[in-house]
Regions:
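Gly/Ser/Thr-enriched, mixed-charge loops and adjacent short helices
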Residues: 75-207
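Proline/glycine-rich low-complexity loops and linkers
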Residues: 40-45, 95-130, 229-309, 313-315
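A short, gly/pro- and small-residue-rich
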Residues: 72-99, 228-244, 318-329
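Phosphate-binding and adjacent anionic-ligand microenvironments
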Residues: 252-431, 436-456
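N-terminal small/polar loop signature for handling phosphorylated ligands or for N-terminal nucleophile
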Residues: 2-74, 166-228
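Short glycine-centered, acidic/aromatic-flanked micro-motifs in structured strand/loop junctions
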Residues: 11-13, 81, 153-155, 229, ...
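Short glycine-rich phosphate-binding loop at a beta-alpha junction
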Residues: 4-14, 150-152, 255-261, 304
Length: 456
């Protein structure tokens, strides 16, 4: 175990307005303990973890200052050790320690120790970009492996602009039409979020208008990404899961893909029947799916991919790090390989069926004890389906690891819904997909059931 003075911690941030002041405060705190601080400046979250991996840095830990896609007035910290991102139990312990310290105590410690650690500027993003470039060169071949490809990048004014400028362009890609590459914490163009409707419409337009072979879009801190093919088809939600899995299917036949709970039945059919993989539909929360995949591997079950429909994709080959730029790089490689063969990215997902309609509705729980009350509602719903569901062609899905998932199959509608508790808010999100009829047919059933409860 190292002493504090032997530790080296990297600190980076996204484009948020409060980033610099928070970085300064973090640096003062670390240096007061004698810790060496590597100032990485504008960074992506995955690059900060990689500062613990790259030999030229080998940091003992990393702190990323970001609030992902949340509103511009929010900010926060993501913590990494060499083993990966800290879990909620670790975060709870950090908060407990912080709550036990007063400002006076901290100032006294600072003066007493007088052990200022060094601050060093670190080009982690440059090293990280080089790492991604080498990955493309190795798998596509040549010094300009992307020559002849037009790839549009939408960074949403977050930290992802480097991908167009420092990864794609130096390898010969035409990045004409790329947009919002400049970091701007006001996020003036659209929410930097691959799940956001306006954001996806924006990158789709850019691909079509610029006749691009591929479009890529990142969230603020680049731990998530989605794509658009040359036809303007969105590759997000279920489709980004399918794409991420298809990219490794030949190398890892039969591997288990762990996803969050709101994936479609059509995705399961694609993964299992078209790709020959196994699908474990687990829980929302990217740490949940990553930890489940790690657990499977520890128990002798091969799992090469943990991914959320939000665009968090973590490959075993990449330290189970949810890395939007790494996923984007694998998609770029596949696009380049297909281009050489005279094909486009659309062939990869040609067998993936899309639902006729998909919606999400969120119910507010109007109770102070919303967590317990929400669980009671879910238990009652499960009992109701078991008791009366057969009358309307409704049946419980099993196994199921989060909320209550119900299949509907009757004359009017064929589809499914999932009612679950929100990870953080007093809400009950309802996800609905149908291949026949309308989502409103299923929503009506859930609305009628919830009428007896204190929700709105």
């Amino acid at each position: 175990q190292k002493s504090e003075k032997e530790l080296k911690i990297s600190v980076g941030h996204d484009s948020r307005i409060t980033a610099e002041s928070l970085k300064e405060a973090v640096g003062i705190g670390l240096r007061s303990l004698g810790i060496t601080v590597l100032d990485c400046g504008l960074s992506s979250t995955p690059a900060m973890f990689m500062s613990t991996v790259f030999e030229e840095y080998r940091c003992d830990g990393a702190i990323m200052i970001t609030a992902s896609h949340l509103p511009k007035d929010r900010n926060g910290f993501k913590y990494f050790s060499r083993e990966g991102g800290l879990d909620k139990e670790d975060i709870a312990q950090i908060i407990k320690i912080a709550e036990g310290l007063s400002l006076e105590e901290l100032q006294a410690q600072y003066k007493e120790k007088n052990a200022l650690g060094q601050v060093k500027q670190a080009g982690v993003m440059s090293t990280y970009a080089s790492y991604l470039r080498e990955m493309i060169k190795k798998q596509v071949g040549g010094d300009n492996p992307l020559e002849g490809l037009r790839i549009v990048v939408d960074a949403g004014n977050g930290a992802g602009g480097f991908y167009a400028l420092d990864v794609l362009k130096p390898l010969g890609a035409d990045i004409t039409g790329s947009q919002f590459l400049e970091p701007d914490g006001n996020f003036p163009n659209h929410q930097p979020n691959p799940e956001n409707k306006e954001a996806m419409e924006s990158i789709c337009r850019a691909v079509i208008e610029n006749k691009a072979d591929l479009g890529l879009i990142f969230d603020t801190d680049v731990d998530r990404s989605s794509a658009v093919d040359a036809s303007g088809r969105e590759i997000n939600r279920n489709a980004i899961v399918a794409m991420a899995a298809a990219l490794i299917a030949k190398d890892f036949p039969g591997t288990t893909v762990v996803t969050d709970s709101i994936t479609s039945d059509q995705l399961t059919e694609y993964l299992e029947n078209c790709l020959g993989l196994k699908h474990l539909r687990f829980k929302r929360g990217y740490k949940n799916v990553i930890n489940k995949a790690k657990e499977l591997n520890q128990n002798g079950v091969d799992s090469q991919l943990a991914i959320e429909t939000s665009g968090h994709a973590a490959y075993k080959e990449n330290y189970f790090l949810d890395d939007g730029a790494y996923l984007a790089t694998k998609i770029v490689i596949k696009t380049a390989q297909l281009k050489k063969a005279g094909a486009g990215l659309d062939v990869v997902l040609s067998s993936l069926e899309e639902p006729k309609e998909a919606i999400e509705k969120r119910f507010s729980i109007n109770r102070a004890d919303f967590a317990d009350y929400g669980q009671e509602i879910l238990c009652r719903l499960e009992e109701w389906v078991e008791r009366e569901g057969q009358q309307i062609g409704a049946s419980l899905v099993s196994p199921n690891y989060e909320g209550v998932r119900i299949n509907f199959d009757n004359e009017q509608v064929k589809g499914w819904c999932l009612l679950r508790k929100s990870l953080h808010d007093p809400k009950l999100p309802l996800n609905v997909e149908v291949t026949k009829g309308s989502c409103s047919d299923i929503v009506r059933v859930i609305d009628e059931f919830l009428a007896d409860f204190d929700v709105s």
